[in-house]
Amino acid sequence: MKAELIAVGTEILTGQIVNTNAQFLSEKMAELGIDVYFQTAVGDNEERLLSVITTASQRSDLVILCGGLGPTKDDLTKQTLAKYLRKDLVYDEQACQKLDDFFAKRKPSSRTPNNERQAQVIEGSIPLPNKTGLAVGGFITVDGISYVVLPGPPSELKSMVNEELVPLLSKQYSTLYSKVLRFFGVGESQLVTVLSDFIENQTDPTIAPYAKTGEVTLRLSTKTENQALADKKLGQLEAQLLSRKTLEGQPLADVFYGYGEDNSLARETFELLVKYDKTITAAESLTAGLFQSTLASFPGASQVFNGGFVAYSMEEKAKMLGLPLEELKSHGVVSAYTAEGMAEQARLLTGADIGVSLTGVAGPDMLEEQPAGTVFIGLATQTKVESIKVLISGQSRLDVRYIATLHAFNMVRKTLLKLENLL
């Protein structure tokens, strides 16, 4: 099946917003075994949108339109598609009730007539309820071509796709079962090299590598009758892949950290902290709180994290963490001594079970004769204090800080897994 994505909105063409919906939808379609062959962006113009829909209908089996479902005159996606299909717009009862409930809590004057447009669907379509907004989506098949209309705001679109569209498409078309393996500590080129025979000779299941900032994923996919058979086939392939070794002789199982498209090193670490009822603190220099803000983004973070430190300058490291200023000057802020001292002092000052620290050179200039991308990460527990040195070369300042944070989470994760093995 060939699918096409159409993003509707002049703000996309003018660069005011980034079309993140296209990436999300492409990934979701891939999970369902639906190939996205084309992506188009078009402004809020009926004539041009009609032209784009016409072209898409001639070359694609599934046409997904995003955006333009709001209350204003330039929100014309449903109206234009209805015109193309020669269908009327009708009101969806559930969407109308949601409008009633929403405006019942507001001043009567706030419900202007144009808001009613958000409750309209194309006649004969299956409504797609909007759990986080007011504009209802829809699914309709005409002359063998299926059309989907979705809201533009990502929070609304993602909810509608996950809860409404994916289950609907799964029933309509044969399902592709997938498993995503996540790796940290090996590059895409090396991973593809050590798995080249699997990738070059793949039939079913298939293997698709994807490089992300600082990590790599492998999507294993199979088309089969049910989940149980898929789990068996994908599990066998996974075991074969993880038995391979990197070019340095390290088992791939050692750089594999988890499953899932939406998973992360931070999430894996957070869940282990919760599992073992451990608390953590951090003292950050070059990452300036990125580790702590990432950890705090998870619901329930207060179970494991009470606070930490951001000490950017040498003087603040001495003042906030109680590290000897003369020793800091002697060893330098970009050093194992400073990283270990920051981690241990943070742990002692907060009473946490684990202290982690990040100090280094974000770039682009050198610091203390150390090149950009040099990072020291410290980790302290009740029984030991240690540090690692990481060189993150060829990256922007932003990516150096982000990848350093990944290394810190991975270091904590490995420490917690050692605890798991002792139980």
Curated annotation (Swiss-Prot):
Disulfide links within the chain: none
Listed Pfam families: CinA, CinA_KH, MoCF_biosynth
InterPro entries from the UniProt entry: CinA, CinA-like_C, CinA_C, CinA_KH, Competence-induced_CinA, MoaB/Mog-like_dom_sf, MoaB/Mog_dom
Domain of life: Bacteria
Family: Belongs to the CinA family.
Protein name per its UniProtKB record: Putative competence-damage inducible protein
